[in-house]
């Protein structure tokens, strides 16, 4: 007869057999928690741990993580040692030589819901709560995450699924309550180089007396995110308490969302979406709205650029996405307005963190004639928020936004935000640049946003803050052969050469068309 064993009643000395001594290997595995064990380790044999197994690891601080196992077949580790990647080491808060305990994690029950989605079945709130909870706890490997995102993209998510996913993502993170209303916010769907309206919009709204706690992302696939650009002007890595202090002091902020962890699962999903190049409508809506709800927003304007090389390419796609945003947002209590904008070309002159920051400063310092498109875009978006927040009469928002720029109040509000976040600083400039000239006489007829953004990244953006591209011409500009078309800016000559070689192979990134003579 088989004898049942109560595992919970096992003596402590048995659990100690699953303990190894920690060694910091200094291996950067990005966001992956990875552990390293000898292939002949007695625990691997006893527990049946194989390469890439998912293992629950805990240390003396009582913190525990789920990590991926890599087996070592050399003498990198001594018998009785376990190596840890930087991510695993820091999450467990270990010291060299600490005892580390290893056990099998609990079964991943939410995978049954992922399998259901793979076969096209809809997921309910309980399914999504379980999946999102396991993602937040680090129980999903990248393979599991990829399966969930791919299935969600392949089988269109219903309104109910998108709404429930949004709520699940909000509920696993912090949710801010500012104790007052309205709390205004904005988001840009993206896909357009430049277009750095957020710092200007926040400054205008704060100058008008509205509260705007803006959390922004770093670049995912673009040459710059709002957080990257703002970081060239002031610190952005503030925790929730520091963010709250800034907002209570000056009325608004522009901080990196990753530091405040308001929708932590979203950052994990975005990392996988970037690798897979997947950006489904349902996931986009849940991503945006979960962060806005978690930040305490009550009124939201969404900038949706539409153009042949933008993220949203057709009016039909824009209408579909707009409908999803409006329905889900309204159902979750958000006062939301979508503004479709021109996505046929970059907004502003700079593409890259510091170059976009210089555009922002030009607008705020009443030099917007240098970037008129950015000035108009920012005042339209800010004007809509001013009207929604009842800081301006209906139909007068853009006028008031322009007035706040001209009289300097928006600039003073921006300065106050920068000082409250740690101090204003001037954006850097790149030591190397090269001007690309128009190859012929004519008119700028088309700009490929995607390939222009790729060139800016090859020049070093966003990792090199001063790198990127400055446009010297826009759609409709009359060009003479040899006239500056755009310039490349890089931190190193190697990156400059790399980007230039790419541009030389892509002469149609900015197309110069022959000017049609009137008959």
From Swiss-Prot:
InterPro entries xref list: Glycosyl_Trfase_fam3, Glycosyl_Trfase_fam3_N_dom, Glycosyl_Trfase_fam3_N_dom_sf, Nuc_phospho_transferase, PYNP-like_C_sf, PYNP_C, Pyrmidine_PPase_CS, Thym_Pase_Put
Superkingdom to which the source organism belongs: Bacteria
Disulfide bonds: none
Entry protein name: Putative thymidine phosphorylase
Disulfide bond found in the keyword field: no
Catalysed reactions, semicolon-separated: thymidine + phosphate = 2-deoxy-alpha-D-ribose 1-phosphate + thymine
Keywords: Glycosyltransferase, Transferase
Biological process annotations from GO: pyrimidine nucleobase metabolic process; pyrimidine nucleoside metabolic process
NCBIfam families: ARCH_P_rylase, PRK04350.1
Enzyme Commission no: 2.4.2.4
GO cellular component: cytosol
Name of the top EC class for this enzyme: transferase
Classification via Pfam families: Glycos_trans_3N (PF02885), Glycos_transf_3 (PF00591), PYNP_C (PF07831)
Gene Ontology molecular function: 1,4-alpha-oligoglucan phosphorylase activity; thymidine phosphorylase activity
Similarity comment: Belongs to the thymidine/pyrimidine-nucleoside phosphorylase family. Type 2 subfamily.
């Amino acid at each position: 007869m088989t004898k049942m064993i109560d595992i919970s009643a096992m003596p402590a000395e048995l659990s100690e057999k699953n303990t190894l001594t920690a060694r910091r290997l200094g291996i950067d595995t990005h966001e992956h928690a990875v552990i390293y064990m000898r292939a002949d380790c007695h625990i691997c044999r006893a527990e049946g741990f194989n390469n890439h197994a998912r293992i629950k690891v805990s240390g003396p601080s009582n913190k525990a993580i789920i990590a991926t196992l890599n087996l070592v077949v050399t003498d990198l580790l001594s018998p009785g040692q376990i190596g840890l990647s930087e991510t695993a080491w820091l999450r467990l808060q270990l010291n060299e030589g600490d005892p580390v305990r290893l056990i099998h994690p609990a079964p991943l029950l939410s995978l049954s819901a992922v399998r259901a989605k793979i076969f096209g079945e809809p997921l309910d709130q309980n399914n999504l709560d379980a999946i999102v909870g396991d993602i937040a706890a680090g129980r999903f490997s990248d393979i599991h995450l990829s399966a969930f995102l791919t299935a969600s993209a392949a089988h269109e998510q219903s309104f109910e699924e998108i709404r429930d996913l949004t709520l699940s993502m909000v509920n696993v993170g912090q949710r801010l309550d500012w104790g007052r209303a309205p709390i205004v916010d904005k988001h840009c769907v993206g896909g357009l180089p430049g277009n750095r309206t957020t710092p200007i919009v926040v400054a205008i709204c704060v100058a008008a007396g509205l509260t705007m706690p803006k959390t922004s992302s770093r670049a995912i696939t673009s040459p710059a995110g709002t957080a990257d650009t703002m970081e060239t002007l002031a610190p952005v890595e503030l925790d929730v308490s520091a963010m709250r202090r800034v907002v209570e002091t000056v009325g608004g902020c522009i901080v990196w969302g990753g530091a405040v962890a308001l929708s932590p699962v979203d950052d994990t999903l975005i990392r996988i979406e970037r690798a897979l190049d997947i950006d489904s409508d349902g996931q986009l809506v849940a991503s945006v709205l979960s962060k806005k709800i978690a930040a305490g927003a009550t009124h939201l304007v969404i900038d949706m650029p539409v153009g042949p090389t933008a993220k949203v390419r057709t009016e039909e796609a824009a209408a579909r996405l707009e409908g999803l945003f409006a329905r889900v947002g309204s159902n979750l209590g958000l006062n939301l307005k979508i503004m479709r904008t021109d996505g046929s070309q970059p907004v502003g002159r700079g593409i890259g963190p510091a170059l976009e920051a210089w555009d922002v400063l030009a607008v705020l310092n009443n030099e917007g004639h240098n970037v008129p498109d950015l000035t108009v875009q920012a005042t339209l978006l800010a004007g809509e928020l001013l009207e929604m927040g009842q800081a301006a009469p209906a139909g007068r928002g853009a006028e008031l936004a322009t007035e706040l720029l001209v009289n300097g109040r928006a600039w003073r509000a921006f300065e106050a935000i920068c000082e409250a976040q740690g101090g204003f600083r001037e954006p850097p400039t790149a030591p190397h640049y090269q001007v690309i000239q128009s190859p012929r006489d004519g008119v700028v007829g088309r700009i490929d946003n995607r390939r222009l953004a790729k060139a800016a990244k090859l020049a070093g953006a966003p990792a090199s803050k001063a790198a990127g591209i400055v446009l010297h011409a826009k759609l409709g500009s009359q060009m003479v052969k040899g006239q500056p078309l755009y310039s490349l800016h890089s931190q190193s000559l190697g990156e400059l050469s790399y980007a230039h070689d790419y541009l030389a192979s892509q002469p149609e990134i900015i197309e110069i068309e022959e000017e049609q003579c009137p008959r």
